[in-house]
Regions:
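Short N-terminal segments immediately surrounding and downstream of signal-peptide cleavage
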Residues: 1-13, 99
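Extracytoplasmic/periplasm-facing segments of secreted or lipoprotein envelope proteins
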Residues: 9-26
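N-terminal post-signal-peptidase region of extra-cytosolic proteins
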Residues: 22-25, 52, 71
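Short beta-strand His + acidic residue motifs that chelate non-heme Fe in jelly-roll/DSBH
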Residues: 27-29, 47-48, 72-79
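Short, conserved beta-strand element in jelly-roll/cupin
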Residues: 31-47
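Short acidic-glycine-tyrosine-enriched beta hairpin
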Residues: 53-70
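Ligand-binding loop in jelly-roll beta-barrel domains
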Residues: 70-93
Length: 102
């Protein structure tokens, strides 16, 4: 099954997505274009399929972590219950206009 990713906020600074994974659900292979922070809402194991192989990551509810842009993976819920986390993608800040220019 496919994980469910409703976007809660999408503006010029961030994209905030709540990811919900039934047991065995996955994101599909993707590459992160932005730096991001993940805040797990549940505790459990995720299996990550990366270009370098598979890794199992243990999420702990409330323990946030940061990753840089460019990460490539497929994320799979590897435990028996639902897995939920909030992902905050951080968009680059546009430089202010030069002095005297509109």
């Amino acid at each position: 099954p496919q994980a469910v990713p409703p976007v809660q906020v999408d503006n010029d600074r961030v994209v905030v997505t709540e990811w919900r994974f039934a047991p065995g659900a996955q994101t599909g292979h993707h590459r992160h274009g932005y730096d991001y922070v993940v805040v797990p809402m549940t505790t459990g194991a995720l299996r990550l399929e990366t270009p370098d192989g598979e890794v199992v990551s243990q999420l702990v509810a409330g323990q946030a972590y940061y990753r840089g842009g460019g990460v490539e993976h497929n994320v799979i819920n590897a435990h028996e219950g639902e897995c939920v986390f909030v992902e905050i993608e951080i968009k680059p800040v546009a430089p202010p206009p030069a002095a005297g220019k509109p």
